[in-house]
């Protein structure tokens, strides 16, 4: 932003704020807009650190606004996030805390998080986990997601075994690799090939895409826990703590 524009905006803000004070109205009436701008300019030049303070405050307010907008979106879409039949439910379907994970089969951090999710399932009997296919990294990711959804349609009980085989594998995930993983766990490959192109698969991908946009999810993995979004992978201990906090007070950070 050009300096002149910056100063003019600051001047406008200062002038607007000053008008709120009745005692200052008489003094302002005797000063021109140019005089006020000059005073502000001189003050800023003598105290340049105020610009950094203003920028930090602006960023803070923007972050707070973004977090509020995201929280509102989570609340508005809570049923789709946690109860949609198009999500894959792991763990306790009636658990007292639900962790939703958006993932991509070609996401390296998702691969690392696989063991953490497995540990959570093993160690927390009151946890419900919902997996959301969110293929954003490549066309191969979309192909793999289509196969995965077809696996869920054919045999939900086999999904977790398939998921671990595909996400835990090396190399790029795509349709062929995903089909091989499905065959390995004993599923009907011809039926999967047919179901991959079904309206249900398209609707599932569309649902995840719309949720991702509503929550402003820009990468994977991303977790929804309580009414908050956790962008990026967290190690097991931090995920466990976050779940405990939500269980305790409904938020990621409970007041002391």
List the predicted regions and their residue ranges.
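Bacterial N-terminal signal peptides that target proteins for export
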Residues: 2-14
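Short pre-active-site segment immediately N-terminal to redox-active cysteine/selenocysteine motifs
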Residues: 103-106, 219
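The canonical Cys-X-X-Cys-His
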Residues: 107-111, 223-224
